[in-house]
Structures are given as C-alpha cells and as structure tokens.
Amino acid sequence: MAVISKKIPAPDKVEIKTALISVFDKTGIVDLARALSARGVRLLSTGGTFKAITAAGLAVTDVSEITGFPEIMDGRVKTLHPTVHGGLLAIRDDSEHQDAMKQHGIEGIDLAVINLYPFEEVRAAGGDYPTTVENIDIGGPAMIRASAKNHAYVTTLTDPADYAELLEQLSADDGKTAYTFRQRMAAKAYARTAAYDAMISNWFAETLSIDTPRHRVIGGALKEEMRYGENPHQKAAFYVTGEKRPGVSTAALLQGKQLSYNNINDTDAAYELVAEFLPEKAPACAIIKHANPCGVATGSSLVEAYRRALACDSVSAFGGIIALNQTLDAETAEEIVKLFTEVIIAPDVTEEAKAIVARKPNLRLLSAGGLPDPRAVGLTAKTVSGGLLVQSRDNGMVEDLELKVVTRRAPTAQELDDMKFAFKVGKHVKSNAVVYAKDGQTAGIGAGQMSRVDSARIAALKAEEAAKALGLAVPMTHGSAVASEAFLPFADGLLSMIAAGATAVIQPGGSMRDQEVIDAANEHGVAMVFTGMRHFRH
C-alpha cells in the first residue's frame, strides 16, 4: 500500500506572531486575547469572537480581510479557504511551501484557538432534527485538525483550561512555545474532534435507528483521573459521554473523598437497580457490593425500606453502596451512618440529612438530581481483545410483559407482586441469578454461579443466616416468590427453590425441558409464570 511520506523537522521553540481565534465558548477568551495583544501578537478572528474581542477595545483582523472573501450562508462558510488552511498547514522550513505562501499571499498562523458549536449540549437538551444538524461544526474541526497536524510549528488550543499554561510558556520563553507543549495540545485536539465526531455519528445512528453502523466510535470527555483502577496496579480515569442520564456521571458529590473506580462501577449498578422502583409508588432502597445487590426492599417510608434492605444480608452490606429512589431525609440518614458505608446516592438530599452524614466525613454522598428512566434506550459497551461489544441497554420492564401462567395454580395477587419484585432485582444480579422475595423485600440473593442450582442454594443459605440474625423462626424464603433471570434448564433448580420454601416462581421459560419443570411445579402445588424475556448479566 502506498503511503504519504515526508520528514518534517520539529523546532523546539516556535514564536507566536499570529493567532487565529474562533470560539463558541468564549470563557476567558478576552483575557487571552488581551494578553496576546500585549505581546504584539497579531489577532485574526471570525463572527461572534471577532465582535467580543473588538468590544474589549483590542485590535483584531476579521478573517474575511485576509481571505478577500466574506462570510456567506449564515456563517457556514468563513474559514474554509486556502489562505486560512495554508497558513495553518505550511511547513515553515520547506522551500516549496514558502514559495507557495509568497505566491498566494498566505501568512503563517502560529496559534489556533478553536472550540466548537455545542452539538453535545443541543443533543442532550433534545433539540429537534434541524437544530441539531445546524449545530454540527464544520470549519472548527477542519482548523483544529489542520493546525494539530502541523504541530511542529503551530500551537492548537481547544480547551479554555489550557490558556493559562500557554501564557506561562510565552512568559518563560520570550513569546515561544515548546515542542512538547504543542505535541500535547495536538493530541488533545485530535481527541476532541474524535469525540465530537463520535457524538454526531452516534446521534445519526440513534435517530435513524441504525443498530449496527459500519463504524462505531464511543467518545467521552475526561471527568477525572483516578488514583488507580479496579486494583492498585491498574491505571484508570473516568470519562463522561454527554448522555444526560441521572446517575453517577451527572451526580454532585456533596461530601467525601473522590470516588474510586470500584465506587463508580458499584454506584452505577446500585442506582440503575433502585430506579426500577417508581418513587411515586413506594420508597425503595438497594444495597450493593461488587456490583451485585445484597439487599433490596420497598417500605412505607424510606427509612423502613433501608432497614428491610439491610435485613436481607447485613454482613455483606458492610462497606457497601446505598441507593435510594427518593430524597434522603434525616431519619434515614441517621440509620445509614450507623453502618460503615462507602457511598450514598439519592435523587436529592435534605439539609438535615447532609448535616447528619457530615458526621462521617469519609462517607461519599451523591445527589443525582433525578432517577434514570429504566425504559430509556441507550447503549452499553464492553471491550474484548481487539474489539468492542456494543448492545442496546437492557430496558425490558416486567410491567410491560405479558406474563403467562403455565401451571395449574395461578399465583395469588401477593405472589404476583413478589414475583415482579424479584424479577426486577434479578435483572441486576450477575448470572446465574436467583432472587427470593417476600412482601417487597429480598429474602435471599444468589449471584454469579456457574450452576443455577448453586445460586438457588446460596440464596437460601443467605436467607437462613438472615433469619438467625433477626431471630426469626423460619427464613423469609418460606412462602416467598423466586425469580430466575434465565430459564430453568432442569427441574433440579426448581426443586431447590421449593425446598427453600418458595411457593411461586417467575422465569423467562424457553428451555427444551420446560414441561419437565412445569410438571414438577404442579406436583408441588407451586405457581409459575413465564415472562418470555431473559436478563443475562455478565
């Protein structure tokens, strides 16, 4: 395959003589322009940026003056001109490039300060199709890519956070920038345009219902660097995609240390689970460890929901993540701070609750500003060696399914409620998952086992341990409903559930041996329904 090859010398220091400034986000731009002007840098600009700099009383040249071509088509075409791009792309030490610049009257541009139309914000705000398309920047990305490619000679700034470092360099090096700085800024510039284009391409795919586009790019903006990843020897950072889905990426940290990699992963799992329970129907609480629930419950009040969730497995809850579907109040906060907890996340927090949690300064408190919609469409992604697995979010809701009673005995109204509750929780448990529930409370959770029978047994064992801790005569699995997130392949799993005391079973169905499982349920007088929807989770 033929490739383009050209060796370009990279001088260490390059003096900034001419700067092109064209920004939508004008944060700090006047101060930057003033500092550059004070150093004798010639300023070129466009549109609204030109007006802002002129209004500050600074000398600035409109790009149309150097191109000899006016802005046209509502500003769609203003910098897409050889005079601009030649000034950005010219190799200063190449005699042919120098000759071309002289021949065509092109002036070298040493600094490009560019940021883009707010496509991400318009998309997140639900802008209509024409408005969203109109906010796709064309000239900005073109200039960023051109200047960043020529970073041997040109400095590219795409983030107002970098203005101060530029000015420090100019002060320290007599108006010059170092190659290492230009190189870093170029890398940042290409990352910015890549993320921008990824957002646009994904928006088109979603809007046009293109499930498997020929190319898929998932972009994000760095929110924070982390001390380490899942383990101390792993490096990690948290990126946000711009999706305005209430949760750990959008929540405000009201107190406590920076969230760790594991905190973020677990908090996301906890909040997505608790959002399955509508706050207007009942308060709900989910307690998570290692991305698996160890207790979930509803209650007549938020504090009751917390107490009931904790009762399922108070040992595993130590050092866990607590997610609530309603505003954290003082009474609930008083209960939570009695136990060592890593993170609390809720839609909102009362001032009284904040004061109570403040007694535990290391306890991280997050206010998410709302609950994620469990029915909303979206994507999930997972890296594999040399690839990326992308799928639509599991937004199936048991309330939307047509449940099929497959046994002679139909479930009672209470059993049906508990079935739905258990199936909701099971959707958020690592497979193989078995969840016992009774009266809006998990009685036992079995997660992540290679055998579904083992998950059923572990869940029953957890219920027995909870019964002993609570002084109950029998475990709560007695008279409970039980959910399996995938079909029961054999009757042995069902028999384990019956042995634990379950009287009703909810599962997707679809096994070759469904009839064998149904027959076993009928033999023991157990009610069973099929959902027709599986919830594998890996």
From Swiss-Prot:
Q: Which InterPro entries does the record associate with it? A: AICAR_Tfase_dup_dom_sf, Cytidine_deaminase-like, MGS-like_dom, MGS-like_dom_sf, PurH-like
E.C. number(s) listed in UniProt: 2.1.2.3, 3.5.4.10
- A Pfam family cross-referenced in the UniProt record is MGS
A single Gene Ontology MF term assigned here is: phosphoribosylaminoimidazolecarboxamide formyltransferase activity
Under catalytic activity, the entry for this protein gives: (6R)-10-formyltetrahydrofolate + 5-amino-1-(5-phospho-beta-D-ribosyl)imidazole-4-carboxamide = 5-formamido-1-(5-phospho-D-ribosyl)imidazole-4-carboxamide + (6S)-5,6,7,8-tetrahydrofolate; IMP + H2O = 5-formamido-1-(5-phospho-D-ribosyl)imidazole-4-carboxamide
Q: Which family does it belong to?
A: Belongs to the PurH family.
Q: Which domain of life is it from?
A: Bacteria
Under the cellular component aspect of Gene Ontology, which terms does the record hold? Answer: cytosol
Organism whose genome encodes this protein? Rhizobium johnstonii (strain DSM 114642 / LMG 32736 / 3841)
User: Keyword Transferase: yes or no?
Assistant: yes
A Gene Ontology BP annotation from the UniProt entry: 'de novo' IMP biosynthetic process
Query: What is the protein named?
Result: Bifunctional purine biosynthesis protein PurH
Q: Which SUPFAM superfamilies match?
A: Cytidine deaminase-like (SSF53927), Methylglyoxal synthase-like (SSF52335)
Q: Start and end of every MGS-like domain?
A: 8-158
This protein's pathway: Purine metabolism; IMP biosynthesis via de novo pathway; 5-formamido-1-(5-phospho-D-ribosyl)imidazole-4-carboxamide from 5-amino-1-(5-phospho-D-ribosyl)imidazole-4-carboxamide (10-formyl THF route): step 1/1; Purine metabolism; IMP biosynthesis via de novo pathway; IMP from 5-formamido-1-(5-phospho-D-ribosyl)imidazole-4-carboxamide: step 1/1
Keywords on record: Hydrolase, Multifunctional enzyme, Purine biosynthesis, Transferase
Q: What is known of its domains?
A: The IMP cyclohydrolase activity resides in the N-terminal region.
